[in-house]
Each structure stands twice: as structure tokens, then as C-alpha cells.
Amino acid sequence: MAMAMRSTFAARVGAKPAVRGARPASRMSCMAYKVTLKTPSGDKTIECPADTYILDAAEEAGLDLPYSCRAGACSSCAGKVAAGTVDQSDQSFLDDAQMGNGFVLTCVAYPTSDCTIQTHQEEALY
């Protein structure tokens, strides 16, 4: 006697695709912070939700900041925090000493307070 197998697959109704830079629900917050970016062409203050990477918020605000991997695995988007705090636990490039000196990778950094970041700091890392 032959046995028949049947598999069914269904997509969740109303499921939204993952958004790059969106924090998991356990880390989400409704807060938004003022992030001042000190660029070679001048200072620009943007509003950055706590669940959005600083680089993504800057691009949405029309700024053109350097980046390459968008994964925290290189130094193209390096900046230096002059004031405030960020969460960059998604990065894998900077060592403890570099982070202790204020360096941040804007492509994987979330603001955790109002902050000021000097952008275009890749060369200062070395």
C-alpha cells in the first residue's frame, strides 16, 4: 500500500518584510533623538528614532555620508561621538579601545540619547 505525503506552506497574512536597521521588538522604543552630525560641509541636526540606524536616518534627511558594507564590518562610515551615547552592539569591526575613544560605525549605531557625531573619521582610526 503506497502512502501519500502532502506538505503545505502558507505565508503569514499581513506579515511585513524585515526592514534594514530595525531593532527587534524587545529593543524598540517610541523615542526619537536629536543627532547632530558634524560633516565637512557643516553641521546638520536630524531626528533619529531609537530603532533606526543613524546612517539610515541621515540618508532619509538628505545627507550623503560615507559607507560601504552597511553591516558594521568595515570602517567606511566611522564617526566619533563628541556628546551623548549610542548603541552599536551590532558592529564587529571596532575594538574596545577604539570604542572607548568614541569611535562609532554609523551604519549600525542607534542613538540612545541626543548626541553629536563627527562624521568622516575613517582615517582617524589608523
Curated annotation (Swiss-Prot):
Its main location: plastid. GO terms for molecular function: 2 iron, 2 sulfur cluster binding; electron transfer activity; iron-sulfur cluster binding; metal ion binding. Residues 1-32 form a transit peptide. Disulfide bonds: none annotated. The keyword Transit peptide applies. [2Fe-2S] cluster binds at C69, C74, C77, C107. Binds 1 [2Fe-2S] cluster. It is found in: Plastid, Chloroplast. The keyword Plastid applies. InterPro entries: 2Fe-2S_ferredoxin-like_sf (IPR036010), 2Fe-2S_ferredoxin-type (IPR001041), 2Fe2S_fd_BS (IPR006058), Beta-grasp_dom_sf (IPR012675), Fd_pln (IPR010241), Ferredoxin_transit_pept (IPR023383). Coiled coil: none annotated. Residues 33-123 form the 2Fe-2S ferredoxin-type domain. Keywords: 2Fe-2S, Chloroplast, Electron transport, Iron, Iron-sulfur, Metal-binding, Plastid, Transit peptide, Transport. GO terms for cellular component: chloroplast. GO terms for biological process: electron transport chain. Its cofactor is [2Fe-2S] cluster. Ferredoxins are iron-sulfur proteins that transfer electrons in a wide variety of metabolic reactions. Forms a complex with heterodimeric ferredoxin-thioredoxin reductase (FTR) and thioredoxin. Belongs to the 2Fe2S plant-type ferredoxin family. This is Ferredoxin, chloroplastic. The gene is PETF.
